[in-house]
Amino acid sequence: LIRRTYKYAPLLLLLFVLTGCGTSPTSYPPLDPATAGFFTKYFIIPLSDLLDFFANSIGNSYGISILIVTIIIRLIVLPLTLKQYKSSKRMQEVQPEMAKIREKFKDNPQKQQEETMKLFQKHGVNPLAGCFPILIQMPILLALYQAIVRNPHIFSHQFLWMELGKPDPFYVLPVLAAATTFIQQKVMSAQNPMNKQMQSIMFIFPVMIFVMSMSFASALPLYWIYSNIFTIVQTYFLYGRSPKTKGGQAA
């Protein structure tokens, strides 16, 4: 079980990093390209400018601007997601052979691991494929958070009932962020038999998302909600219409 948590390590790391982020624009220096470091200059400022551009183009709505930027970010990582999908399909196809390896070498874990890796290489299965979309999104999500709290237009912007730079006073966004995270994990775990053994770990994420969303600027859980819905819809189109095996998994 522990060996299978590697896939979620990047997300856990990101959540812990974000936990240390402040919610006040005074916690950070202003966005000045002349004095900005590499990450600020090439990630935070362009993302802040992109949010400003879309907001100014659609009636000064930063809530909708975040939606557009979310879609752009998800489209950027879509090729990696498709690669992950293909690897996941291959993983499902080799499950019977993996079961035979586990049974044959049940008393020799090292040999079992060696034979499993040979099987992965033979069928082009990459067990790390699930990490890549998360790893790509990590710097973008960190940049998005700082773009929000360091951009005075976004920080003070009113969208629906909340100010995007402050926590949701009614906890609606934390609940929605946690709920969509739960649904996303549930939908994705149904596609991979290995994930079913990880449900107890995966269900921790919605709780973490809820707790952190209560203190984060509302724009970040709003991004999570948009991104989770995108993932749920994407998973349906990738897996939902696939033929099923006897075990109920996509073939």
Predicted regions, residues:
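Helix-loop-helix
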Residues: 2-251
